[in-house]
Amino acid sequence: MSITFEVTGYCPCTKCCGKSDGITASGTKAKANHTIAAPKTYAFGTKIQLEGYGTFVVEDRGGAIKGNRIDRFFDTHQEALNWGRKKINGKVV
């Protein structure tokens, strides 16, 4: 089943996370092109394939992450800003 996600970006800086250690809510070290923050409706470890971008793993949460909104992790703040906000079709795999 295809889901349209609203995907924003974040990084390990204090502006994005309030801390800068890069440790996710699940206790893992966040990795670019791997980690996403998703609502609690998606258990930690859930894999979500984003059309055209690959498969990511739910390892984090976020205060504004609700419904079909997810946050893709980037190594730098500039990369997260450059990503912006995108609507992307995806599915749980």
Language-model segments: what does each one mean?
Residues 1-93:
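Solvent-exposed, well-ordered loop and adjacent helix/strand elements within mature globular domains
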